[in-house]
Amino acid sequence: MKAAKLPIVVSVLNHKGGVGKTTTTANLGAGLARQGLKVLLIDLDVQANLTHQMVGDLEANEPNICEALLEEKPLTSILRPTGTKGLFIAPAGESLIELDLNLFNKFGREYVLKNSIAQTEGISSFDVVLIDNPPYISLATVNSLAASDFYLVPVSCEYLPMMGLKYLQKTISRIQKVNPALKPLGVALTMYDKRESIGQSVAELLREELADQVFETMIRVNTKIKGSPSTQQTIFQFENDPKGRGTLDFTAFTQEVMGRLNLQKGAEV
């Protein structure tokens, strides 16, 4: 019997917080869904900011990604639709803080998430899975990267990032022993402000060091991007304007990502 086609899995990560990691995950996911693709978001960050933005905070007893992984179950029972057609989430809850401790003694602990994704009923109907990771290395991060085809690194243009990127690359190199197929999708420049010289310096430095790994689109500083999570909306919903700055930036970024992943758009939402 022919195996079901699995979606492309992308880990979104950076060891530094406050770089737009969750914002990038949420709005890229929405951008892909708006292009007619079916997208699954997985929240592995104990802060659960992605979950809050997409579906609100979970009650303490509601099942979430932690229970699915620890019980080695498919994700079917915890998947939730979001306010964007074609965009779903496997949410995080309070119990996620215990994930590393409970995974530690499991056999094949690096592959628990990969197995859960593969066992999820209907997973072949998804085109892309985006995983939001905590801003530090953990067993959750190892699971994410072991399950992924690509990794995407958001970098804020508000500070020079090279030391952090070198440390992250060391982590990736170690993980590639577990998942040799893991490849870089690219570096996404966030919080770009043309009025600040540091932003231009960061962009130039990264393009010099990493060449075409850096996406052409730069996500500009935008109060609406910062404000949309508190309203449980993506930038597309919050601006509700095809010419809005955030909408334009994330639409362009989404199209670049689709090009790198060789994804064709479906019926646009």
Region roles according to the model:
Residues 1-269:
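P-loop NTP-binding core
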